[in-house]
């Protein structure tokens, strides 16, 4: 399926132009053929008039001069032939040009006066015929039939030459027409390219709305998109502010509960209750932090940023190397230094931070970060040489809130945030075996 609107219109216009030319071609050929036949008829009629003016009847006999005014009648190889027949159909005279021709022609004498048609000689060659019934004896009806002929081959030669020339003319006209159509469509689609460029600038964060300098037919679309952008921005801000207000409103009750827990901890009999209370307080704090992260890291509707991968990996790994200095982790980078990911910086930091922290925590000593660009997508992965994940547990681990490591305390919030980020960017997360021997978290984002 052709997805380019300009190419669709161009192909449609080209098809119509070709069909028009194909319909025009036989019409022009027919018109030229008719015009050429009329010209030949008029020429033969003029030649008949020449013969009539030259003919005389003396003592009941037809007399013709030896040299006629039309030179073609006097040349043996000429294409114009002249004949005169009596009313019985007997040949009385033929021109010098017709001396070598063997045409068995019989006048019709049907009272029409003159007639234009075709006939053939003994060899099968076709001739145009102009036959005039005329009274040269002043009073006797149709005493003679004066006939002029011309070979059809000359007509066919002219028609063939015109046909070849017509092909060239129409072919050239078609190419010029297609070129003009292409230029017209290119000029007409400049507005669409301008709109596309502005959308690219919005996706990259270079501008916040579409301009008003577009054709009238596109203004409704641009106004609707601008309203959508403003509405999405306001809704996003309200969402962030609401969650921020909620978090701040819960801080004081949590602080009070923490203080009560500290007071209860001073009494030996309340230690178990205090432990449960503090665990729930910590869980509530983590959930609040998780929701705040979701609010701040979700992708904007139309804005699509690209962030360089190498600097972020360097920053995160420098920090993790200090935290896990005892492991002496060896980091391998399997991507181009210029590789970029279609994710905002904050979201990408959070996403990679969670995956790299898991890899550093569970590895034996080797971690690898890789990325590549595929047809229509960007893919990156984080893998380690740790214990890996059994195949039957992988689906559970990549579900929100499930934890890959149950040996250490936590709520699985980090991976849940990572999943939220991936889903907000229409991405996919998969868990495979690593070539290093451990687990490989693979993420794929669409780039179109």
From Swiss-Prot:
GO biological-process terms attached to the record: phosphorelay signal transduction system
Point out the coiled-coil segments of this chain.
Answer: none
Main localization category: membrane
Membrane topology field: Single-pass membrane protein
Summarize the record's disruption phenotype note.
Answer: Deletion mutant displays significantly lower virulence than the wild-type strain. Also exhibits a constitutive polymyxin B resistance.
Question: What is the annotated signal peptide range for this record?
Answer: 1-33
Keyword Transmembrane helix listed? The answer is yes
Localization, UniProt? Membrane
Under Enzyme Commission nomenclature, its number is: 2.7.13.3
Instruction: Enumerate the spans annotated as HAMP domain.
Output: 186-237
One of the record's GO molecular function terms: phosphorelay sensor kinase activity
In the record, which positions carry Phosphohistidine?
A: 248
**What is the protein's given name?**
Two-component sensor PhoQ
Q: Which organism is it from?
A: Pseudomonas aeruginosa (strain ATCC 15692 / DSM 22644 / CIP 104116 / JCM 14847 / LMG 12228 / 1C / PRS 101 / PAO1)
